[in-house]
């Protein structure tokens, strides 16, 4: 997006002066009362809208303006890489926290205006990050590298058994509580 090449991480003077807000991209603006346009509600682009107010009444700020008013210095975004349990092109009422990773570092399609176009996902994700940076807010991405949604992941199809911790019986170790765990020690 325009200005991306000049964008940079927002550095804090002192970590003791930080105010961190954890949020879920869809929850941030999904409700109609958020004042975000219908096209951008629950999407990356919701973060690019300024001047949003509760029910559009002009009294109580919402979304990015609300974060600025609170003095939030950092947002920690729940996982927004490609996750399995939401049909990206399906019913918009589907919800997941994002802790069921499929493709690490690929922006989740359900948060984009066009889940079928990888370029759109990337551009809109970058626009969200840039809008937060432009507001003086640092961005932290919550990541889950200790497991994948399925044992039949791209890792296992590439090099079977290598990327996962296995018991001597060839069954998957389940230290993550999700049916498998990546072998981060390799």
Task: Name each region found by the language model.
Residues 26-186:
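Substrate-binding/active-site clefts of carbohydrate-active enzymes
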Residues 1-19, 29-38, 57:
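An acidic, Gly/Ser/Thr/Pro-rich helix-cap/linker signature
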